[in-house]
UniProtKB/Swiss-Prot annotation:
This is Guanylate kinase. ATP binds at residues 12-19. Belongs to the guanylate kinase family. It is found in: Cytoplasm.
Length: 207
């Protein structure tokens, strides 16, 4: 019997390494894990593929999905809408596949309200100085933009207590191992094992 997959909410301030950790976790395309593909109204960027990076829809289509209660969570960011499909998540979880939501604390609160069993993981940088170094090191933004992102990062980090697990991304390999350990631990809970090993348990306890 296939155990239901777990829903992991992964949040972090910009520069904490969240996207890199998720990419490393899934680089070998494991059959039992996948990242949720969000819907968005923004235009595709060069190289982005519809259905792989995002589900690209227009504003009218997105608002129709909101009216249908089709999203676990949705938000408007810089004039564009983003949302997580309720149907896709539920279907994937019933197949025994763990799903990762790469969303902020506001989205996490929305998901937790409808699926309290979702597992929250917050990624932190080892220090404020290191976070600023990472943001500056990208070499793509002005000081004003970096200052704005730092302020936004501090605001985001203030919600770390709302999550079930906290990973400090000081050493990348250690942080990745920590993330894998969290996933493994959730697959070994009593509820998960009872479901996954139902036939074996019945056989062991047969009179």
């Amino acid at each position: 019997m296939t155990a239901r997959g777990n829903l992991f909410i992964v949040s972090a301030p910009s520069g904490a390494g969240k996207s890199s950790l998720i990419s490393a976790l899934l680089k070998d395309k494991p059959a039992d894990m996948q990242v949720s593909v969000s819907h968005t109204t923004r235009a595709p960027r060069p190289g982005e593929i519809n259905g792989q990076h995002y589900h690209f829809v227009n504003v009218e289509e997105f608002k129709a999905l909101i009216a249908q209660n089709a999203f676990f969570e949705w938000a408007e960011v810089f004039g564009n809408y983003y949302g997580t499909s309720r149907h896709v998540i539920e279907h994937t979880l019933t197949q025994g596949i763990d799903v990762f939501l790469d969303i902020d604390w506001q989205g996490a609160q929305q998901v937790k309200a409808v699926m309290p069993e979702a597992i929250g993981v917050f990624i932190l940088p080892p220090s404020r100085d290191e976070l600023e170094r990472r943001l500056t090191g990208r070499g793509q933004d002005s000081k004003d933009v970096i200052d704005s992102r730092m302020a936004q990062a501090v605001s985001e980090m203030s919600h770390y207590k709302e999550y079930d697990f906290i990973i400090v991304n000081d050493d990348f390999d250690t942080a990745l191992a920590d993330l894998r350990a969290i996933i493994r631990s959730q697959r070994l809970t009593g509820a998960s094992q009872i479901h996954a090993q139902n036939d074996m348990l019945n056989d062991l306890l047969a009179g």
